[in-house]
Amino acid sequence: MDARAINSREKADLKYPRNTYIIGDVQGCYRELQELLELIQFDSTKDRLGFVGDLVNRGPNSLEVLRFLKSLSSPLIVLGNHDLYLLILGYGLMPEDSYEHTLHAVLQAPDKLELLEWLRHCPLIRYEKSLSAVLVHAGLPPQWNIKESILHAEEISTALKGPHYLAFLKNLFGNEPSQWKEDLEGQDRLRYICNAFTRMRFCDAKGHLDLESEGKTNQAPSRFRPWFEWRNPQEDNVDIVFGHWAALNGQSSAPHTHALDTGCAWGYKLTAINLKTKERFSVPWQSALRM
């Protein structure tokens, strides 16, 4: 099922989809994405797709992934740190050779600006009330409830969609401030919010971020834990669906949290979850198809 198949159909009204499937970090693995859609028997006229960010980079086909997702009818998409990195590169705010990446085809594409425009209008959080679920790339820090998280994510959306988005993106990278304070202002405030939603793995009970550690949950530095171990599922009363942390291999120890990054771009698999039934589907990395 490719983008042409989607485009050839009349886009359906998906207000009441048959199924809603959320897919983990695609990271440019277009062929695996298509294999996964075949596995779940995705029907664009009846089903809805969602993605927990990191749509691009590391895998070989980021351009094809973006074009395909843009063709979908009302997909549920949140941004990840690699997607923000593409925006920074795409708008010329950082030299293309600053870091190793696989985004060259996107950066040279004739529809680059159209794709970037579409991407920066995607949010950092999606709350699906009908399914009692929140989509976010990295996670939700413990000091914010669901409502507060949504409001803070909207601050980033406002910056990305506003007239000064280039200045916001240019100064986005950095690990500080790592501690949330209500009186944070300007770029410091936005950087913390963005890091929490797109880069966080370990934090302390007050939302102090450790952005250096990337290992398994038992490798947390002193006083830090995986963000989901601090949250109160009774207070949240929703399912939190996230990606970003490939070392978890799709496993989360906390109730009502669903980890979907199963390391496809690292040679493992791409995973989807049916939000209604919680059934999971996975396809392996197609190494034989790599160029």
Curated annotation (Swiss-Prot):
Keyword hit for DNA damage: no
Keywords of this entry: Hydrolase
Disulfide cross-links: none
CDD domains: MPP_ApaH
EC code(s) of this entry: 3.6.1.41
Reactions performed catalytically: P(1),P(4)-bis(5'-adenosyl) tetraphosphate + H2O = 2 ADP + 2 H(+)
Claim: 4Fe-4S is one of the keywords in the record: no
Transmembrane regions: none
One Pfam family it belongs to: Metallophos
Described purpose of this protein according to its UniProt entry: Hydrolyzes diadenosine 5',5'''-P1,P4-tetraphosphate to yield ADP.
UniProt-recorded name of the protein: Bis(5'-nucleosyl)-tetraphosphatase, symmetrical
Species of the source: Coxiella burnetii (strain CbuG_Q212) (Coxiella burnetii (strain Q212))
Gene this chain is encoded by: apaH
